[in-house]
Design a protein with these regions (language model features):
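Beta-lactamase-like hydrolase cores
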Residues: 68-134, 199-210
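Hydrophobic membrane-insertion alpha-helices, especially the h-region
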Residues: 43-55
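N-terminal low-complexity, Pro/Thr-rich disordered segments
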Residues: 63-99, 285-286, 398-411, 429, ...
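C-terminal soluble interaction/assembly domains
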Residues: 368, 374-496
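A small/polar active-site loop signature that marks catalytic segments
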Residues: 250-415
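Active-site SXXK
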Residues: 123, 137-155, 245, 272-277, ...
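Mid-domain, small-residue-enriched loop/turn segments at the edges of structured enzyme/sensor domains
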Residues: 112, 170-197, 201-243, 250, ...
Length: 496
């Protein structure tokens, strides 16, 4: 079975024309494919609890046993914290990590390996190889995009899709606001998304006599398809033109993660709205305007709908490695910062945001924001720094003679990044990986795959209670062997 999506990894060797490989998901039949809302509930102090909004939880105890239960979903992501009775001092931990990773790095399956392992408690690098040198990251790039969005926009940020009325008429304009997660009828691919049906219902209340024509304003984004992307990605289901209003990120079949993507997603959304209203599709607003003159619009919108909060959309982006959603979220950051919502503007916004918060991307090349471009170059250290901030412990500060827990604003903002990472052998792009290995249910990481590039970056809780972050990027490697080598290395870290 070919189980892939996005620009990242799969257990298949299928590639597009330029070798972009799609990522694995949990299940491939209709809506049951989704593992929703996986969250870390409580500090990791010998016990890791991962609760799922779908009613499933994985509990990992000190004996590394995985127990499946069905507690309520946890609504907050707590930082991993090392066990107080950890048996390893800093020197012993570094020695063990170095021994494991030196042996792992000797595996030729890694190809040209760039890697780093750090202690999340201290941020100290425990092992590294080419860790400051840049490499092609594939979809591990999404860690940087997600981090920039959480830092700049905040986890509650939403995107609005609005409709205006052409003055003096019953004709309306659908204005794309940058949300690719809309569904047709509320039963789409993405969790808690707004729908065209909901929008139509609101419009009908304001214009009960009926709408004449529906026009599309798709002007927010001026670039939709990166010059390094392959058009074969539409048919293969891992990319679509990045337009300002889209249903299911362009999936023609929203029940199928791997569905072929539409070449005209914004026009599809406008057509769906026209049909829902029993109106005529008027086409592009730009084309409808005569002699370059704008059509007059009423100042107040007829209706609007809002996307799920950013924290939900980041989880979807990371869990399924959705490239369209990644590019759209990066453009939200660009708009927030007053930059053009283009590929270059979005990449600049990601870079500038991270630098302002203490995560400079020196030497990096950001060509797009999804990792799909083969021109991207980042280092394991770039990934490690944000992962360490997200996964680091709460610090203590003396206030009035008492130790009060506190954390940096960056750590607070980045906490949801932890929850967005797929769980080994459980969810998202790691659902079919680590099966039968000691890292199953223990490792949480973002994957990445392009031709001759494979990445795995995230964190692992060791047997001794340590929380380690890691970033492994292989270039010039065969995909499946490189992936297997990374899984083996991460599992070995879990056994420390």
């Amino acid at each position: 079975m070919f189980v892939t999506v996005g620009s990242t990894d799969s257990d298949s060797s299928k590639t597009a024309a330029k070798g972009t490989q799609k990522s694995s998901s949990s299940v491939k039949s209709g809506k049951s494919k989704k593992s929703r809302g996986l969250k870390i509930g409580g500090a990791i102090a010998g016990v890791l609890v991962i609760a799922a909004g779908s009613g499933v939880a994985v509990v990992v105890n000190n004996n590394r046993q995985i127990v499946v239960d069905a507690p309520p979903a946890v609504s907050h992501v707590s930082a991993p914290v090392t066990a107080a009775q950890s048996s390893l001092d800093d020197g012993t931990l570094a020695q063990k990590v170095s021994a494991i990773m030196d042996a792992a790095a000797a595996d030729p399956a890694f190809g040209e390996l760039h890697g780093i392992v750090s202690d999340a408690t201290t941020g100290q690098k425990l092992w590294g190889i080419n860790d400051t040198a840049v490499a092609m990251p594939a979809s591990s790039m999404k860690i940087l995009t997600a981090s920039a969005a959480l830092l700049d926009l905040g986890e509650d940020h939403r995107v609005s899709t609005r409709v205006s009325r052409i003055t003096g008429t019953n004709d309306i304009v659908l204005h794309g606001g940058g949300d690719p997660t809309l569904s047709k009828d509320g039963e789409g691919f993405f969790q808690d998304s707004a729908s065209i049906a909901e929008l139509a219902k609101k419009i009908s209340v304001v214009i009960p006599e009926g709408v004449g024509k529906v026009y599309l304003d798709n002007s927010l984004f001026t670039e939709s398809f990166h010059e390094t992307w392959e058009r074969a990605g539409l048919e293969d289901g891992y990319i679509a033109p990045v337009e300002s209003v889209m249903m299911d990120a362009g999936r023609i079949d929203p029940t199928n993660e791997e569905s072929q993507r539409s070449a005209t997603p914004a026009a599809d959304a406008a057509d769906a709205l026209a049909k829902a209203l029993g109106a005529e599709n008027g086409g592009s607003l730009r084309d409808a305007a005569k002699d370059g003159q704008s059509l007059p619009l009423d100042p107040d919108p007829v209706a609007l709908v809002q996307s799920a909060p950013l924290v939900t959309r980041v989880h979807e982006m990371m869990n399924y490695s959705d490239n369209v959603l990644a590019e759209s979220i990066a453009r939200e950051v660009a708009i927030s910062r007053g930059l053009p919502p283009t590929f270059e503007g979005a990449a600049r916004a990601v870079r500038d945001t991270l630098a302002e918060h203490g995560f400079p991307l020196d030497g990096a090349v950001l060509s797009d924001s999804s990792g799909l471009s083969t021109d991207n170059r980042i280092s394991p250290q770039h990934l490690s720094e944000v992962l360490n901030s997200a996964a680091g412990p709460v610090e203590s500060a003396e206030q009035g003679g008492l130790a009060e827990p506190q954390e940096s604003s960056e750590s607070t903002s980045l906490r949801p990044l932890l929850d967005s990472l797929p769980v080994a052998a459980v969810s998202g792009t790691l659902a079919t990986r680590f099966v039968g290995q000691s890292g199953a249910g223990i490792v949480r990481a973002k994957t990445g795959t392009l031709n001759k590039a494979s990445a795995l970056a995230g964190y692992v809780v060791t047997k001794s209670g340590q929380v380690l972050t890691f970033a492994l990027i292989s270039n010039e490697a065969s995909l499946l062997p490189a992936r297997a080598a990374a899984d083996k290395a991460a599992s070995a870290l879990a056994d420390i």
